[in-house]
A protein has these predicted regions:
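Rossmann-fold dehydrogenase core element
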Residues: 110-136
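Short beta-strand and adjoining strand-loop segment in the mid-core
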Residues: 104-114, 145-162
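Rossmann-like NAD(P)-binding element
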Residues: 44-90, 96-104
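General beta-strand structural signal in soluble alpha/beta enzymes
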Residues: 52, 92-93, 130-134, 179-182
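Active-site-lining helix/loop region of Rossmann-like oxidoreductase modules
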Residues: 2, 152-221
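Glycine-rich beta-alpha junction loops
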Residues: 73, 95-98, 138-139, 160, ...
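A short helix-to-beta-strand connector/capping loop
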Residues: 43-51, 127-130, 177
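NAD(P)+-binding Rossmann beta1-loop-alpha1 motif at the extreme N-terminus of oxidoreductases
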Residues: 1-42, 173
């Protein structure tokens, strides 16, 4: 979990730890990662498998890496950990190019030369690493409250079908969440735009956890 000490990363790490997964919280500061792991264990309220390491060491010790850093830190983070990647790993990009990256509004996104943050991530990591876009539209506020189910849907995009299946299984392990195969990685462009819309809805309706629900599909991945 790169950026696991931040709000979104903390929330996802908490939910997966509570679901029985072994979770490694990564941070530029190992001490901050250890502290976040300790807080996750306390918040879970029951024994969980969670630890904290530097980002580089976290990548070395896991098969699925989840990137939750702000968009402004995406490139630097991936370039720093690039030597630690191993063939066959899956990178899940949660970062969204909101306009706040350049001092603008959180209700808008900025253009990305690669097309989307997910595609940008794919252009940086080794070709032997499969990149997946997922969890971009899930409220950190909701994830961080273990007393509530995550009653929203997760759109999963990737050019690697096996990597999508791995991430869809991770979605299933979060109480209340449903995963949908949203096609190729280029569809990240649409998925990331939805995040800005949800932020706008949060502001308009004075809430913090607006989410997405897909209807009309009886079979969920």
């Amino acid at each position: 979990m790169l950026g696991g000490a931040g709000e979104e990363g903390f929330g996802l790490a908490l939910r997966w730890a509570m679901a029985g997964h072994q979770v490694i919280v990564g941070s530029r500061s190992p001490d901050r990662a250890v502290e976040a792991a300790r807080t996750i264990a306390q918040t879970a309220g029951r024994p969980v498998r969670v630890s904290g390491l530097s980002n580089e060491n976290a990548v070395l010790q896991t098969d699925v890496i989840v990137l939750t850093v702000p968009f402004t830190a995406l490139l630097d983070t991936l370039k720093t950990v690039k030597p630690s990647f191993k063939p066959g790993q899956v990178l899940v990009n949660v970062s969204v190019p909101l306009e706040t990256a350049i001092g603008g509004r959180a209700t808008r996104t900025v253009g990305v030369w690669a097309g989307s943050a997910g595609e940008l991530a794919a252009s940086v990591v080794p070709k032997t690493v499969s990149v997946v876009t997922a969890f971009n539209n899930v409220s950190a506020e909701l994830l961080r409250d273990p007393s509530k189910p995550v009653d929203c849907d997760v759109l999963v995009c990737s050019n690697d079908e096996n990597a999508k299946r791995i991430v869809l299984d991770l979605v299933k392990s979060i109480a209340g969440a449903r995963g949908f195969d949203a096609g190729a990685l280029e569809n990240s462009r649409t998925v990331e735009q939805i995040t800005a819309l949800l932020v706008s809805l949060n502001i308009r309706y004075k809430v913090k956890n607006a989410g997405l629900r897909i209807t009309g599909i009886s079979h969920v991945s």
